[in-house]
Amino acid sequence: MTENMIVIYHNPDCGTSRNVLQLIEAAGYLPQVIEYVKEGWTKPQLLGLFAAADLTPRSALRTTKSPAAELNLLEETVTDAQILDAMVEYPILVNRPIVCTPKGVRLCRPSEVVLDLLDHWPSGPFAKEDGELIIDERGNRVYT
C-alpha cells in the first residue's frame, strides 16, 4: 500500500458508508472504492481484513437490514466458520464500511472512526449527511 493509498469496502446504499467516503474524499484522498455487495468476497480476503481490523466474523456480522436472522446466524451456537461461509455467499452480511490505510484497517462505525486512519482531515466544518457535526470550523474533531 503506497503512502496515500486508501481502500474502502463500500455500500453506496448505506449512509455511514457514504459519510466515510465523503470524509476521505474531502480530505483530498482518491480512494479505491470496492462495492463489495456487487463484487463479493473470498474467504482469504475476509480473513485478512478481519485479522487486520481485529474483528471476528461474528463481530463483523451485519445483524440489521440483512438476512442474518433468516439464516439463523444470530444463534450463539453458530460458528465463525459458518458465518464466514454465509458472508461469502451473501456479501451484504458484512458490516461496512471497512477502510484500509497505511495507518491500519478498521470497521468505520460510526463514520468519524475513519479520522483515526487519515494523516490529514478535511478543513472544517464538516457534517454527516444527517447534519451531525464531526469536524468544527477550526478543523477539530467534535466528540459527542
From Swiss-Prot:
The active site is at 14 (nucleophile). This is Arsenate reductase ArsI1. It comes from the Bacteria. Catalyzes the reduction of arsenate [As(V)] to arsenite [As(III)]. Does not constitute the major arsenate reductase in cells: essential only in the absence of ArsC (AC P74313). GO terms for biological process: response to arsenic-containing substance. The record marks 10, 62, 96, 109 as: Important for activity. Belongs to the ArsC family. PROSITE patterns: ARSC (PS51353). It comes from Synechocystis sp. (strain ATCC 27184 / PCC 6803 / Kazusa). Keywords: Oxidoreductase, Plasmid. It catalyses: [glutaredoxin]-dithiol + arsenate + glutathione + H(+) = glutathionyl-S-S-[glutaredoxin] + arsenite + H2O. Its EC number is 1.20.4.1. CDD domains: ArsC_ArsC. InterPro entries: Arsenate_reductase (IPR006659), Arsenate_reductase-like (IPR006660), Thioredoxin-like_sf (IPR036249). GO terms for molecular function: arsenate reductase (glutaredoxin) activity.
